[in-house]
Amino acid sequence: LPYLLLLSTIAHAFQYGLRWYIAGRLPLSNGYETMQFLALCVMCFSLLFCRWWRNVVTFGFLMSGFALLVSYLGQMNPQITPLMPVLNSPWLSFHVSFVMMSYALFAFLFLNSLTALALIWKVGMNEQVTSLSLTNRLLLYPAMLLLGIGIALGSVWANESWGCFW
């Protein structure tokens, strides 16, 4: 299963890189592109953690599948269009990238917590619940750090674009 995840990640990264090359900018300007990036982040984090965390491959497929499903729903537009001038800033790309990476980690925290809640009622599962709780605590720190950096970069972008942080 990890090899299938690796193959999927390579294919998705190739598609994302192709979109980046065609657009001439990092594709993070609309909901479709942002959800594509979130799915890529989830897959990359799944590959990073699959040696230490047993459920991460399943969680990675599930969360990246949901992100890709949302990217293809209704009003998400897959067309590559020129950016509005206010969005044509490298600060915006950094801001969105860091926030999406934190959201990918928060998605793992969410599924990990749901798994712990499902196991807490079973007899003899205290060790697994404790392990899931420890994993949550370990992933929460980088998720919060990435979110904080993303918010700070967003305020720098807002200051550059509009002249004030908020």
Predicted regions and their residues:
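Polytopic transmembrane helical bundles with strong interfacial aromatic enrichment
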Residues: 1-166
